[in-house]
Amino acid sequence: MKVLVIGSGGREHAIVEALARSEYHPKIYAVMGNANPGIRRRAEDYLLEKETNVPAIVQYAQDCNVDMAIIGPESPLAAGLADELELNGIPVVGPRKDAARIEFDKAWTREFMARNNIKGLPKFKVYDDYDDACRYLEDNPDVVVKPAGLTGGKGVKVMGEHMHTLEEAREYVKSVLEHDRVVIEERLKGEEVTIMAFVDGKHVAPMPTVQDHKRAYEDDQGPNTGGMGSYTDNIDLLPFMTLDDYNEGVAIMEQTVKAMEKDVGVPYKGVLYGQFMITRDGMKVVEFNARFGDPEAMNVLSLLKTDFVDICEAIVDGSLDKLKIEFERSATVCKYVVPAGYPDNPVKDAPLTVVEKPEYLVYYASVNERDGKVYTTSSRSLAIVGVADTIADAEILSEEGLSNVQGEFHCRHDIGKERLIRKRIEHMDAIRG
């Protein structure tokens, strides 16, 4: 069996490692924007190409005679890569463009949720006119402002965190409207969590809950990033969650998948990522993504017991309900190594020396490899994942991995530490009253 993986980040390295563990021993082919050393090591062959160059990728898939493709990032989904591969007879794990719109058009997603009475919808407005948006802001200052389109996780601004005055909010709205529609939503109070699920068009198979850390600096300070790291507990829940929270999130995702085929006429196949805020009034949808999260993929795929090839085939042929999907009952802590100065002024081409050991997992991301060393680019470099019986023990292993990375870099040491988790628990206790 031959499987093509599109993407060159930590998420795609985790996908490739999950394939490499399969008892089917698939031959792995890759299309990457940069030559990810972890993927390169596992691949029979690879193409260095923009992940949105649809004709080149389809041609490569045909030349390699692949049996299946797995699309990692959002941009090729938005470019319609899944549609073109399927048209050429190649089954895809990843939704077609009309279904992937749930990620790349936030305005459409909110309107889709409203049309289909999907639960967990915050109050929202969509504007393409600056004056109308400003009038709404004056009456509703406690908001979140986001562009309708893709922003790599960095375009969302929250009043009281990224913006502190109405003037700042107006300025941000103005800058968004220069190239996009703007979505203004009520600011939700609670804890953000990620629930991802395998989806075959009808059936939803959820994974353990993950919490990502978007802010660049310790104690949740600094600018937003693509995600500095994440953790899971040794059950499907996180320490501040209830089973009702989890079940409510999964039910919202099931409702969304059901509505997708009815509303859009295209079944949703691939991974659905639900980002939820646990509030006093239950689970609210912060956003949906049409693929694995990065870093969250590295947590859940490191725990996956069921053969990943079986899961991919079940997604493609609509038989997920016949497959029992199991995860190790362990905790994980993932910490990203990023270039010094990331995200605003990342130091490029800085050398990193990485010692890999069996005590922890290393997933490579946006680095280049020369002469046995890896070199930073402008994006996240590599992630270290600790897997253990408890979050505390997994965190110790991730720190051991970080101590074996030499060079100039930044990371968040506080992810998975007791103090930060305790803060989340106390925050949620206060919210629930």
Curated annotation (Swiss-Prot):
Protein keywords: ATP-binding, Ligase, Magnesium, Manganese, Metal-binding, Nucleotide-binding, Purine biosynthesis
Annotated positions binding Mg(2+) 2: 287, 289
Binding-site residues for Mn(2+) 2, renumbered to this chain:
287, 289
Which gene holds the coding sequence for this protein?
Answer: purD
**Ranges where the ATP-grasp domain occurs:** 111-317
Q: Which residues are recorded as binding ATP?
A: 138-194
Free-text cofactor note: Binds 2 magnesium or manganese ions per subunit.
List its EC numbers. 6.3.4.13
* The organism's place on the tree of life at top rank: Archaea
State the SMART domains in the record: GARS_A (SM01209), GARS_C (SM01210)
Coiled-coil annotation: which residues?
Answer: none
Q: Where does Mn(2+) 1 bind?
A: 275, 287
One Pfam family matching this protein: GARS_N
- What residues bind Mg(2+) 1, as annotated? 275, 287
**Gene3D superfamilies referenced in this protein's UniProt entry, alphabetically:** 3.40.50.20, ATP-grasp fold, A domain (3.30.1490.20), ATP-grasp fold, B domain (3.30.470.20), Phosphoribosylglycinamide synthetase, C-terminal domain (3.90.600.10)
Q: Which family, according to UniProt?
A: Belongs to the GARS family.
Return the broad EC class: ligase
Q: Specify the species.
A: Methanocella arvoryzae (strain DSM 22066 / NBRC 105507 / MRE50)
Q: Catalyzes what?
A: 5-phospho-beta-D-ribosylamine + glycine + ATP = N(1)-(5-phospho-beta-D-ribosyl)glycinamide + ADP + phosphate + H(+)
Biological process according to GO: 'de novo' IMP biosynthetic process; purine nucleobase biosynthetic process
State the protein's name: Phosphoribosylamine--glycine ligase
GO MF annotations for this entry? ATP binding; metal ion binding; phosphoribosylamine-glycine ligase activity
Q: Which cofactor does it need?
A: Mg(2+); Mn(2+)
Please name the InterPro entries in this protein's record.
Answer: ATP-grasp, ATP_grasp_subdomain_1, PreATP-grasp_dom_sf, PRibGlycinamid_synth_ATP-grasp, PRibGlycinamide_synth, PRibGlycinamide_synth_C-dom, PRibGlycinamide_synth_C_sf, PRibGlycinamide_synth_CS
- Hey, which pathway is this one from? Purine metabolism; IMP biosynthesis via de novo pathway; N(1)-(5-phospho-D-ribosyl)glycinamide from 5-phospho-alpha-D-ribose 1-diphosphate: step 2/2
